[in-house]
């Protein structure tokens, strides 16, 4: 069994056609991972969208990470991959039930089919192989506004709840739990609390840096702490900032990037104030056996491309060392372990405060009302356009001129097309979204019941729930 091993997570920013120098950067990412000493044993990648880029990274890291899985999801792919020193025994892709809207095509979250890449890896070599690591790599829905005005906060909260449930299930089986990725949340936010509490895991960074920042220095949540604006070096070493750092060239203004593209060497003093940097990438860890612990954690992949002089991604990596620091608490009592596994004692999750459950339920209620209004408007638009289209077709018969008939037909065609699209979204997508919200709401109500009374709600009687969606 492995005494210690390294893990790494990185958002590669590999958007096809959109990310600049994609091929060169992702190829170099593979080279940098392969040159690490000590090398990582498990790597989780996000925004690795193309098979070509995945293969380039696999080729560069084959000698240290001979096993890997590229996960397929959605229309354009979820961009998730897991690489491993040891064989991947089981694997699956779990898509999030709530994940953006198709109307936000310019954002793409719905089209890529975001979810959780799951892998079961048994660590160690030869006869000493034993413990199973449940690896989860994810990329949560992006926040396009600040909370609480973010219209997607309900989706991101549901996603945090969903991955936390997967983590809790792995914990209940006595496995080592590793959830890594770009969670698009700040520390101690609602989603963060859900993953830690409902998922029964610990934020690896806060284990070693409990007083680290809980947002960018310019954010209200951080200003209330009354701490001075940190410099770039402090943000990396103490705050774990992986995004929006002044050291990352992709966060520079257009003027600086143009100078860089012309071959000019631009350096940034690590003592430069860094008010916008924040931590969006995480490693969550749990071990029900208390056998392994996180002994070190750091921000990595901060180097630049050797020829382009750009950062390798718009995010930095998070890296951690897991070490066997003690004997399993059930090493001398395997029967007790078997009893706890079969009785479900490991599955007794921690509970969030009742007020938190209530706030989530209020969020769901508000969002559900919003989506019902959206559905009514979209279906009304479809009905109105259908009426207009029929009117235009009738008017063609009395049209005195050909060009007037052409304009009526054009109006009918374009208007009805827009109406049909709105009707499909309102009738099909929103209906599906409302059903997913019902499932999420039931989960939260059930968890609240356990937190309050110690018992789940169970199935309600017919008529207790609103079946109309």
List PLM regions with ranges.
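N-terminal, active-site-proximal structural segment of metallo-dependent hydrolase catalytic domains
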Residues: 1-59, 325-469
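Cytosol/nucleoplasm-facing, intrinsically disordered, low-complexity tails
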Residues: 1-31, 35-36, 60-61, 124-129, ...
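Structured beta-strand-rich core segments of catalytic domains in phosphoester-bond hydrolases
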Residues: 2-4, 12, 21-22, 34, ...
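Active-site beta-strand/loop signature of hydrolases that rely on acidic residues for catalysis
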Residues: 6-13, 25-57, 83, 118-121, ...
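Glycine-rich phosphate-binding "P-loop"
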Residues: 9-21, 140, 148-156
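Extended, low-complexity, polar regulatory segments
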Residues: 28, 231-266, 272, 287, ...
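Conserved beta strand-loop-helix elements of the APE1-like EEP
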Residues: 76-91, 120-124, 230-231, 275-291, ...
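Metal-dependent phosphoesterases centered on the DNase I-like endonuclease/exonuclease/phosphatase
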Residues: 149-288, 330-335, 402-419, 426-434
